[in-house]
From Swiss-Prot:
This is tRNA pseudouridine synthase A. It comes from Streptomyces griseus subsp. griseus (strain JCM 4626 / CBS 651.72 / NBRC 13350 / KCC S-0626 / ISP 5235). Homodimer. It catalyses: uridine(38/39/40) in tRNA = pseudouridine(38/39/40) in tRNA. The keyword Ribosomal protein does not apply. The gene is truA. Formation of pseudouridine at positions 38, 39 and 40 in the anticodon stem and loop of transfer RNAs. One of its GO terms (biological process) is tRNA pseudouridine synthesis. Its EC number is 5.4.99.12. The active site is at residue 62.
């Protein structure tokens, strides 16, 4: 996965949103409806191309997860881009299903890679704990928790999780992939008007199921089933704990992806590719 388009191609950055309800995640799969599959099909159609141009994305969201601020890139032949640049957004809007929208398509600066150049990803997870349930008009984006939640206890637990750690206890292990991440922010707020609690979760990157597992641990603290120190104790153990529940995906939204200044894009991509170890960790 290069940080430059091949000669004769233009790297195009795409900024997009989607409602994840009816998608089997971002990544294309045989016989399943995915965000990547829909966009690649639409690109092939509107550019009248005989080949599929593969997308690279900042955050590979799971089935049912939404995105407001997703970023991807695609390398298009220079002739294709020159022909379709001006009308590409409008044509894609007419071809794509209504639950996925592309808001911007523009040539990316040198060194840009939607996945590896990213400095951080910011997610929001929304939970309602009112006895009567969740507003029917927001039920597709808010989880209902049937016990009252203590905001202060959840934030006390969250503060112990921030920093660079091995999040193996909160991730679904993937062969050859590190579970070391820097959790930059984990903070809960409650909307006084609706009562909905929103967790802001920001990190340089996330491993599989990490956000939803962190939320699951926080809810057990919030409803009093676990003490505030428990999520950090699970983290320190570095193994999956059967008590950590991965919450449902529909409450989760990818809100924003941030990138460094153009001159630093390639360096950031190279840094992100390095296999990470914690300070003081041995090689063997």
């Amino acid at each position: 996965m290069s940080d430059q388009a091949e000669p004769g191609f233009v790297r195009v950055r795409l900024d997009l949103s989607y409602d994840g309800k009816d998608f089997s995640g971002w990544a294309k799969q045989t016989s399943r409806r995915t965000v990547q599959g829909e966009i690649e099909d639409a690109l092939r159609t509107v550019t009248r191309s005989s080949v599929t141009y593969d997308l690279t994305v900042a955050g590979r969201t799971d089935a049912g997860v939404h995105a407001r601020g997703q970023v991807a890139h695609v390398d298009l032949p220079e002739a294709v881009w020159a022909e379709h640049e001006e009308k590409l957004l409008r044509r894609l809007a007419g071809r794509l299903p209504l639950d996925v929208r592309i808001w911007r398509a523009a040539p990316a600066p040198a060194g840009f890679n939607a996945r590896f150049s990213a400095l951080w990803r910011r997610y929001a997870y929304r939970v309602g704990d009112r006895p009567g349930g969740v507003d029917p008009l927001t039920r597709g984006h808010v989880l209902w928790h049937d016990r009252p939640l203590d905001l202060d206890a959840m934030n006390e637990a969250a503060a112990l999780m921030v920093g660079e750690h091995d999040f193996a206890a909160y991730c679904k292990k993937r062969e050859g992939a590190t579970t070391i991440r820097t959790l930059q922010k984990l903070r809960w707020v409650r909307d006084p008007a609706t009562g909905v609690l929103t967790a802001t979760v920001q990190a340089d990157a996330f491993c599989h199921n990490m956000v939803r597992a962190l939320i699951g641990a926080a809810l057990f603290v919030g409803d009093g089933r676990r003490p505030a120190a428990w999520p950090a104790e699970v983290l320190a153990a570095k193994v999956r704990d059967p008590g950590v529940h991965v919450v449902r995906p529909h409450g989760l939204t990818l809100e924003e992806v941030a990138y460094p200044a153009d001159a630093l894009l390639a360096a950031r991509a190279a840094e992100a590719r390095n296999v990470r170890t914690l300070p003081g960790a041995g090689c063997c």
